[in-house]
């Protein structure tokens, strides 16, 4: 059997949705994000009727159900709605509040996608789209993923 082309990265993120792009932007160099879609952030693009309900400023840990009630408290204390709103404002995306603290883009959800992609580009995140995943395995100290990109099978291994 022929050896597959290998690619090694520090961090591999599966999925270029909101969470994947935010995680990548905060992880820094050596990050690869892969997604099967033709474009990153497809669910963001259609959310909120195309205007993206990007946060709720009244979001509190009590709004979350979990077996570990401290998880939401910990997560929101590290990065809350106002932190994301600061990011939106830094990118000069105009927004408005609808009901009960729900914030939407004035123009288009595509602005949020562009913002997240700009944040990833700023820290040299690599993005592979139209890449399908066929298997994931843990091997020693790294994770390896078998993917198909542009009709070619490859193996990507990552420390995280």
Predicted feature descriptions by range:
Residues 49-99:
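Glycine-rich active-site loop/strand segments that organize a redox cofactor
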Residues 12, 28-49:
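Glycine-rich FAD pyrophosphate-binding loop
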Residues 72-82, 99-118, 128:
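Short beta-strand to alpha-helix junction loop
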Residues 145-149:
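Short beta-strand segments that buttress and anchor functional surface loops
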Residues 7-9, 151-160:
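Core beta-strand elements of the Rossmann-like FAD/NAD(P) dinucleotide-binding domain
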Residues 129-143:
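A conserved short coil-to-beta-strand element within the FAD-binding core of flavoproteins
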Residues 34-35, 97, 127-129:
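General beta-strand structural signal in soluble alpha/beta enzymes
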Residues 2-19, 32:
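Beta1/beta-strand and adjacent pyrophosphate-binding region of the FAD-binding site
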